[in-house]
Structures are given as C-alpha cells and as structure tokens.
C-alpha cells in the first residue's frame, strides 16, 4: 500500500539537482546555496565518482534531505535487495523504474524505512515521437497516468513525472500519492533537452508535492538568489491552492 506523502516543510519542496562529477564540487554547491536549499537530488554522474555515499552522509550530517535518483531497474529479487540496503541510509526519496509491476511490488515490500519510493514514468526529455520510436504510439500523458496507477497498485509511494502531467496524475491517484516534478523552468523554456516543462506555480497548482530544479539555479548569476526566488514562488503557490 502506498504511504502518505512526506511531511515536507515549504522550503523542502524545492529539490536541487546536484548534477556534479565529484564530492568536492557537490559540497561546494551545498556551501554556496546555504539555507536557500534544504533538499538535494544526487544521481548517476556522482555515482561514477565513487564518492556517492560520502556525499549522502555529508548531506545528512548537514540536516539536508536526500533524494537518491538512480532509477533502479532489474529483476524483482535484485531490485528489492538494493532497496532493502538503501533503506538503511538517511534517504527521503529514491527512484525505481515504473515499467515492471512485479519489481515495483518487490521494492515496496523491501522498503523498511520512511524513504518514499518514486516510480519513473516517462522522462521529461521525451515526447510522443520518442515514445513512438519505442513502439508506444500514445500521448505521454496517457502513458504517465497508466504507469502512475500501476505504481500505486504495486504499493509504490509516488511518481516522478513532468509537471504537465501533475494534474491528470492527481486526479487519477488522489491526495495520498506523492508527485515530484523535474524539468521545472521558472522563467519559461530555455532551449535545453527538457521537452515537457512547466513553471513553478503551475506544478503546485496542479498537485505537485515537490519540484526538482537544476540548471535554472546552477546557471544563474546568483544561484542562491535564484533558489530564494523559487522558494518565494513555491510559498505563494501553496498559499493559493
């Protein structure tokens, strides 16, 4: 059975994508952002450094929440074993693929902590032509909602999905299911590899619990000011819904 969304403070609803190659750069960003960011996503690039869990430990030591975004996908027994071990670490969110119901059920059963598991639906870099190349000739929103319902039925706690699909997911799954939206573009589209993007206010108005922001903060002239501006926009969006 899916568990209720994490009880997040407003400032924890902004998750910064810590897309860096090593521990030194990761901690440099944490120092630079200070108290403007309370939640960090760490992914595959950092894993390749061999310093992944050192960074995880350091983030926890600094009272930051951690989102492990490694999109686990394997046979059910192997994926469940990974989740069982990962649940021993101070992790708030972790991603698994949302393509395999038996694997999702095994992962949900193996999670023995407060960590919330999020199923990957359709990457925000993909549109309908990309799905068609994979033999799925359907609109992304239809695939995303179908996978969200499958994840919920398997006992997974939520999904990570484009803000464009947050409303349909919330309508289909109800209030007790976590929705985390990456590909957020506070200032509108920026011409990168993200195709299905929305702004901060729209994501929360449509039911998102948290958002992931990377480049709009990382590439800003003043990253801390950019993060604080997003925090203010989140607070306004939450007050309005």
From Swiss-Prot:
One of its GO terms (cellular component) is cytosol. It comes from the Bacteria. The keyword Metal-binding does not apply. GO terms for molecular function: orotidine-5'-phosphate decarboxylase activity. It holds the Pfam family OMPdecase. Its EC number is 4.1.1.23. Keywords: Decarboxylase, Lyase, Pyrimidine biosynthesis. Substrate binds at residues 19, 41, 69-78, 124, 185, 194, 214-215. Pathway: Pyrimidine metabolism; UMP biosynthesis via de novo pathway; UMP from orotate: step 2/2. GO terms for biological process: 'de novo' pyrimidine nucleobase biosynthetic process; 'de novo' UMP biosynthetic process. The active site is at residue 71. It catalyses: orotidine 5'-phosphate + H(+) = UMP + CO2. InterPro entries: Aldolase_TIM, OMPdecase, OMPdecase_AS, OMPdecase_bac, OMPdeCOase_dom, RibuloseP-bd_barrel. Catalyzes the decarboxylation of orotidine 5'-monophosphate (OMP) to uridine 5'-monophosphate (UMP). Belongs to the OMP decarboxylase family. Type 1 subfamily. Homodimer. This is Orotidine 5'-phosphate decarboxylase. It comes from Stenotrophomonas maltophilia (strain K279a). The gene is pyrF.
């Amino acid at each position: 059975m899916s568990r209720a969304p994490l009880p997040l403070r407003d400032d924890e609803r902004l998750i910064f994508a810590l897309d860096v190659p090593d521990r030194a750069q990761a901690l440099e960003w944490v120092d630079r952002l200070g108290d403007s960011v309370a939640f960090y996503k760490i992914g595959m690039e950092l894993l390749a450094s061999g310093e992944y869990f050192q960074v995880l430990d350091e983030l926890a030591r600094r009272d930051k929440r951690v989102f492990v975004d490694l999109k686990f996908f394997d046979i059910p027994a192997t994926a469940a074993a990974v989740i069982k071990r990962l649940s021993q670490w101070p992790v708030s969110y972790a991603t698994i693929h949302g393509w395999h119901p038996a694997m999702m059920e095994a992962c949900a059963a193996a999670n023995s902590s407060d960590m919330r598991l999020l199923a990957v639906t359709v990457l925000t870099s993909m549109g309908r032509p990309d799905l068609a190349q994979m033999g799925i000739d359907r609109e992304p929103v239809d695939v995303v909602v179908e996978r969200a319902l499958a994840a919920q039925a398997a006992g997974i706690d939520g999904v990570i999905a484009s803000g464009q699909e947050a409303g349909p997911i919330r309508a289909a799954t109800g209030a007790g299911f976590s929705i985390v939206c990456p590909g957020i573009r506070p200032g509108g589209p920026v011409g990168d590899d993200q195709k299905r993007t929305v702004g901060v206010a729209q994501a929360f108005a449509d039911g998102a619990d948290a958002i992931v922001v990377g480049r709009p903060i990382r590439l800003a002239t003043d990253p801390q000011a950019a993060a604080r501006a997003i925090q203010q926009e989140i607070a306004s969006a939450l007050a309005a819904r």
